[in-house]
C-alpha cells in the first residue's frame, strides 16, 4: 500500500500533537493541521450550578488558539472543523444514557471508536492527505506474516493510551501515524523546546473534555434540563450481599462500581458499591474483598492482532486506564441475545470490574483486541 506525502495532523493545542507536527515537518512531510471542534464550552455554563469554562482546559477556545499558533509557527495550513452535532449524538448522549442505566462510560473511547478517527480520515482525504497523525502514546506496525496492522503499547508505559484505542479498525491503523510511540513524555517536552514551541511546558489535561471539574452528575442534570428532559426516577434500595436493606438512594446514576464515598449509609467497616441493577434499581454494597471479580464478559469486541477469537486463549487483560494488565483466560461465548461475546476469567480476582468500561486484551506489548464490560 502506497501513500502520498501529505499527512493531516490532529492538533489539540497540547504539547503532544504540536510536537508531532514539528517532528513530521522536520522529516519532510507536507502537513495540514486539523482541529475537531467537539463541544461549546460555554453551552451549559451557569445552568444548574455548572461552572464557567476554565481558561486553558482541554478543548477550550484557548486550545484552538494554541493549535493555530503552532501551525503558523511551523508554516502549515490549519483548519478548524465543526463536529459538535455528531459529538453530541455519538458521545454525549450515550455518555448520559450509560450513567442513567447504571453503567460507567468512557467518553474518550466512545469518541475514538465512533467519531474522531473516522472524521479525521474523512477530512484528511478532503484536503488531499492519505494519512493522519495524532499525539497518542501508542505504536503501530504492519505484520506481513499475519497480514494485519498491529497496535502496540508505547515506550512510556505511564502514558500508554492503547486502552482507549482498542476500537481502531485495520483501515484506520493503516492510515494513522503515532510518532510519539517511541518516546517518553519528558523527551517529548525536550523535542518541543528544541523546536521552540511556546507550549513546551503546557500542563497535560486530566479531565473529560466536555465536563468541567469532572462533575458528571452536575453535567447530566444541566444537560437534561437544557434538553427539556428530567432524570428518570431510579431511586431504590441499598442492600448487602445477603439482601439486607441498609437504606435507600436517590438514583442509580449516582453510583459506580468501586465507589466508597456518598453511599448514604454507615457501617462499622468501609462499604463499596459492588453491583448496580438497572432493572430493580438496587445497589449492592459490601466489603473491599467482596469487590474482587474472577469472571466477567465483554461485548462488541474488536479484534486487532487476530481476525477473530475462535477459541480459548491466554491474555493480559486491562480493565481501566490505570490498571496493570492481569493474566486471564479469554474464550468466545454467546450473549443472551445470541451475539458474540468474550468471557474473561482472571488467574487472580481483580478489583472493581465495572460495567461500561472496556476490557482490553494484550499479548505482552501487542493489543489483541478489546470490548465493553457487561
UniProtKB/Swiss-Prot annotation:
The cellular component terms of Gene Ontology attached to this UniProt record, alphabetical and capped at eight, are:
cytoplasm
> At what residues does the UniProt record annotate the site feature described as Interaction with tRNA?
136, 357
Q: Which Cys-Cys disulfides exist here?
A: 111-209
Is-annotated flag, keyword ATP-binding?
A: yes
Which Pfam family, any one of them, does this sequence belong to?
tRNA_Me_trans
Q: Which family does it belong to?
A: Belongs to the MnmA/TRMU family.
Q: Which Gene3D superfamilies match?
A: Adenine nucleotide alpha hydrolases-like domains, HUPs, Translation factors
Question: Which positions bind ATP?
Answer: 10-17, 36, 135
Under which name does UniProt file this protein?
A: tRNA-specific 2-thiouridylase MnmA
SUPFAM superfamilies tied to this protein: Adenine nucleotide alpha hydrolases-like
Gene (UniProt): mnmA
- The organism named in the record is Acidobacterium capsulatum (strain ATCC 51196 / DSM 11244 / BCRC 80197 / JCM 7670 / NBRC 15755 / NCIMB 13165 / 161)
